[in-house]
Regions:
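Alpha/beta catalytic cores of nucleotide-metabolism and tRNA/nucleoside-modifying enzymes
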Residues: 1-33, 93, 185, 189, ...
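Non-catalytic, usually N-terminal nucleic-acid engagement modules in DNA/RNA processing proteins
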Residues: 1-192
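Phenylalanine-focused residue identity feature
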Residues: 3-5, 39, 43, 52, ...
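Polar/charged alpha-helical tracts
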Residues: 29, 33, 70, 111, ...
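Glycine/Thr-rich beta-alpha phosphate-binding loop at enzyme active sites
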Residues: 152-174, 194-280, 285-313
Length: 381
């Protein structure tokens, strides 16, 4: 199983500026050889924004490899060894629409989604970006059920898309997939379209629903992305039931089968034990990012270190530094030496003591690379 490093999946500007600064010296080639980018992260506004798209980025950015290079100044991102998976990131679009329409129902949300995409020529932009960026695998569009939408008053809304609308959503997902495929085919031919399009299938669909979706496609999908399984509500037993529904379709024989957001320790273990393993199977997750930057400058929250072997998270504070270094000293071939890790931990502690600086953000970024390496090791071992 392979692991994709998500670039720009969360955190504030300070943390991602830290990533940019330390990338060249500290990001190992084996980890930056598989990068997941999200179209929504780059081009779509946050839920609280007044626009759907980010106008300046929409106008100026067409090549995401170039955009990534401008951020990290690393020629490697232009090489064929840097495999880029582009996720459409449509959950962000659903979040934005629902945020501005807090009482919307399922049908109205779908109509708003379609209208917004048409008005902004989103599919055309997506196809253009894929072609200009030489993306290796590009995930098609669906209308995902966001796991959590926060309204202005702080209330969380879950599952705004009703189960009874599934057939309509399935047919729309197939329609969107056909639009992407046909656009890629017009731009660069059918061989190119077949080689990059990564058709998203909702992992919670039953076998009838998967059959319905596949029957609506105007092409034979060779790469598959499985979505909707990253929610915390999908525990190991539910995940196994979902895998039972996927198994008859032999998706593991695809040239690539990617489980979106399922790179956490428990889900990776369940997926591998079920039999979905091998170089053509891949995962990603953002947990390593979030735990690395949990700590705040007020000292009321702490960043965490993941152990390669136990997979346990140890919160970083003056009492745990010795324990972390002792654990790390027994790891064979870690990303950082104990001396390098000690310097990183010192920077994290200074940040959490109210002494933030570019150097402390650099330390958090390096911690992010370590935690990502633990998740990579877990997936690939």
């Amino acid at each position: 199983m392979r692991f994709y490093f998500i670039y720009s999946a969360g955190g504030g500007a300070g943390d991602w500026n830290g990533v940019k600064r330390v990338w060249n010296d500290w990001m190992p080639e084996y980890m930056k050889s598989r990068i997941l980018l999200k179209f929504g992260d780059v081009f779509l506004e946050h839920a609280s924004g007044t626009h759907f798209i980010r106008p300046q980025r929409w106008r100026k950015i067409s090549n995401l490899r170039e955009w990534l290079f401008d951020n990290v100044r690393d020629e490697f991102v232009y090489s064929h060894d840097c495999n880029i998976l582009l996720d459409s990131g449509t959950a962000k679009a659903v979040n934005l629409i629902a945020h501005h329409n807090p009482t919307t129902n399922c049908d109205k949300l779908i109509d708003s989604f379609n209208r917004t995409f048409d008005e902004n020529d989103v599919f055309e932009k997506y196809i253009s970006v894929v072609c200009d960026s030489e993306i290796d695998s590009t995930v098609t569009f669906d209308i995902p059920n966001p796991f959590k939408i926060r309204s202005q008053n702080g209330n969380a809304r879950l599952n705004i898309l009703e189960r009874k609308s599934n057939d309509k959503l399935i047919e729309l997902s197939a329609e969107y997939s056909n639009i992407i495929y046909e656009g890629l085919e017009r731009a660069k031919g059918s061989h190119y379209a077949d080689s990059v399009i990564t058709t998203i299938i909702n992992g919670t669909w039953d076998q009838h629903e998967i059959d319905l979706f596949l029957s609506k496609l105007n092409y034979n999908p060779d790469k598959i992305a499985i979505g909707a399984l990253s929610s915390n509500s999908i525990n190991s037993s539910v995940l196994k039931e979902c895998l039972d529904n996927l198994a008859p379709f032999r998706f593991e024989t695809a040239s690539q089968l990617h489980f979106l957001g399922c790179g956490g320790f428990k889900k990776t273990k369940t997926i591998k034990e079920y039999g979905f393993d091998g170089d053509n199977i891949s995962v990603d997750c953002s947990t390593f990012i979030n735990r690395s930057i949990d700590g705040n400058t007020r000292g009321t929250a702490e960043s965490g270190y993941f152990d390669y072997i136990s997979k346990e998270l140890i919160r970083i504070n003056p009492r745990t530094v010795g324990e972390i270094l002792d654990i790390h000293s027994n790891i064979r071939n870690p990303l950082y030496t104990c001396e390098e890790l000690e310097e990183i931990l010192d920077g994290v502690l200074r940040h959490q003591s109210g002494n933030s600086s570019p150097e402390t953000y650099n330390a958090r970024a390096k911690l992010m690379f370590h935690n990502a390496d633990v998740y990579r090791y877990n997936a690939e071992s």
